[in-house]
Amino acid sequence: MEIKKNYYVITALVNPEKVVDFNLFQWSLLICQARRAGVLARIGYILETQQLLAKVPKEALKQIKSAEIYAQHVHRSLDWELQGLQRAFDSIGLPLVLLKGSLYVVANNRTAIGRVFSDIDLLVPEINLKQVERALNIEGWKAG
């Protein structure tokens, strides 16, 4: 039997009640897929809200709790990064427009719970790109 890409992650997100019947091998695949997709903590949140955490094997629960701690760290780090971004944008009189993950966190959207991301997506008018790059450089960011 061929397992579709991210089958276990999709199952956990769409039908979380099904994961309680997973064996340890399936849990291992779910954890690997979820970590790669940055949604393991999100799955933990879903399992908690569905009152299914008590049915999760302790080996998997440790991984979920670790992912939740890391996601909380990412969200705290975002606050610090946003302060610098806001200073940069204020210095040139442009609004700071966030997209995707960071926007969900700032908006306190439920979608942000357990979400992990490695960058901050911004919307900048093309005409202002050079100006924004200079302001970000002054605040300590360097072009990658």
Report the location of each language-model feature.
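Active-site nucleotide-donor binding segment shared across nucleotidyl transfer reactions
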Residues: 83-137, 143-144
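Helical scaffold of the NTase/Pol beta-like nucleotidyltransferase catalytic core
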Residues: 3-5, 13-100
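Generic alpha-helical propensity signal that fires on short helical segments
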Residues: 40, 48, 57, 112-116, ...
